[in-house]
Amino acid sequence: MTFAFIQAEKAHHPVRTLCRALGVSASGFYAWQVRAPSARAIADGVLTERIRQIYGASDGIYGSPNIHAELRDEGTRVGRKRVARLMRVAGLRGVSRRRSFVVTTRRDRAQQPAPDLVQRQFRADHANQLWVADMTYVPTWAGFVFLAIVLDVWSRRIVGWAIGEQMTSQLVLCALNMAIAQRKPKEVIHHSDQGSPYTSLAFGQRCAKLGVRPSMGSVGDAYDNAMAESFFASLECELIDRRSFETKSEARLALFSYIEGWYNPRRRHSALGRISPVNFERSRATNTPFQEPIDIPQPA
């Protein structure tokens, strides 16, 4: 500790003066400076390099909790505080969610919304028990594209999605059709807001035909559809805020890659024990048939 203090203060005071004041030799200090690093320092260096690799593989998204989880799954025994310290020293920071609620809901007062069957209780005991759905927009230099998603509350997996250039009932129907085709639920609650695409006659008829029970929260209250909003918050800070899309095609490809290449198969969730939605489903022994994603026609 004495030599470390001298190292910190030598820019302000002569080394020999500091050594004399602290009762140590200057030669001892200089020998300390060139001494081989400790085993702990070497281990920290090796660990920091692996942390950098994991951080880079996450495209700079992961903070210390998820990087710690990656190391744990690799068999590396290390404390979370040590990971956080090494990331701080290396200048590595994960992204932070700062999404402000943006109202995209446009209610059609001529249509009667479905009752709220969820009442903000976003819990499910198994797959295909409760789905939440919502829409958002993504800016590009050529205008907006709109994304509709269906998320399984049990595993946080995006089971249906669609991208279009208008916020229509056809857009949400495409997302619902994809979810039905992949999951084949026997009985599921589909919870959304009261936006006109969800209260439309076409959407209601499709739900009735498929045996889907529609549920709708209030207008303009993010807490009534908090889980869908949470996904969009992640999408915003991890993709939209970090990219500028020149074309709508570029945005479509980025959204596809984010959902099917990152979020579902790889992105770790604290609510799932720091594993991804796909790995969470694989870790649970169920009789639910989980199929690989299939191609669903997207609206123009």
What function would you assign to each model-found segment?
Residues 1-300:
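Charged DNA-binding/catalytic regions of mobile-element recombinases
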